[in-house]
Amino acid sequence: MALLDFFLSRKKTTANIAKERLQIIVAERRRGDSEPHYLPQLKRDILEVICKYVQIDPEMVTVQLEQKGDDISVLELNVTLPEAEETPK
């Protein structure tokens, strides 16, 4: 019966194949576009403000945006500050 099913089965149309491929491409792009376009500029602005008060290396600041559900986004900011210098009395 398997041989008969093989010859009688319908082959996928090119439209169905194209649709499946397009769905894969869209899913991959959605995964890659998780970072909003304004995030790099936001990081630069935050770094400028921090540098007004403390001298730090730009690599010491990380900014991440995390999706938690459909309507909740969490912005996480980590800043590694240098050790405080002691002021003479």
From Swiss-Prot:
Disulfide feature:
none
Which GO BP terms sit in this record? cell division; regulation of division septum assembly
Asked if the record carries the keyword Cell division, the reply is: yes
Q: Does the keyword Cell division apply?
A: yes
Q: Which UniProt keywords apply?
A: Cell cycle, Cell division
State its role.
Prevents the cell division inhibition by proteins MinC and MinD at internal division sites while permitting inhibition at polar sites. This ensures cell division at the proper site by restricting the formation of a division septum at the midpoint of the long axis of the cell.
Q: Which family does it belong to?
A: Belongs to the MinE family.
Protein name as annotated: Cell division topological specificity factor
Which organism does this sequence originate in? Answer: Pectobacterium carotovorum subsp. carotovorum (strain PC1)
